[in-house]
Structure formats: structure tokens, C-alpha cells
Amino acid sequence: MEIIKNYNEKELTLAIEGRIDTITSQELDKEINAESGNFDSLIMDLSDLEYISSAGLRVLIATQKKLKSYDIPFVIKNVNDTVGEIFRMSGFDKILKIE
């Protein structure tokens, strides 16, 4: 997994490439936590994400919950068909804000 960070003022976009699995989900969680306090909104661009495991889904839900408690918008964008199917099958497409 590769995480590419891009700031536009106080809006952080994280472009995730590769796979989010049990091991890499911990890296993603650490990266989000390391950047917290530096952004007013978070966009996660998943256009180059190949796969996400249940551990990765947990990171997304935990991130949404934490950011919501601070009224910080969290949006997931550019979900491909493979990852979109995982979101639909798990019901996460109804929980997460996906554009």
C-alpha cells in the first residue's frame, strides 16, 4: 500500500494505492492519526485501491466516527467496481459517505 498526501489549504486528500489488509490497515490508521489536527476535512481517494479487508473497513469506520465527533467532514471518492462491491456487500456503502 502507498499513501499519497496532498493538502489544499486545510483539506487533506489521501490517495491510497494497492491493498488495505490486516497489516497495511495499521499503517493507514497511524498515518491518519499523525495528520489529525492538521486538516479541516479529509478526502480519501480510492481510485487506485485494489482491495480492502475487514481490517481496512474498520479503519474507515473508526476514522469516520472520530472525525464526526469533531465535525470534520470525511468523504471517500473514486471507488472502483471491485472495492465498491466490497462496500455494497458489507453494507458500508450505506454507512460511509462515498462520492
Predicted regions and their residues:
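Short beta-strand/loop segment at the start of cytosolic alpha/beta domains
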Residues: M1-A15
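Amphipathic alpha-helical interaction surfaces in cytosolic regulatory modules
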Residues: T22-I95
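Short acidic-hydrophobic, aromatic-tinged amphipathic segments that line or gate anion-handling sites
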Residues: K97-E99
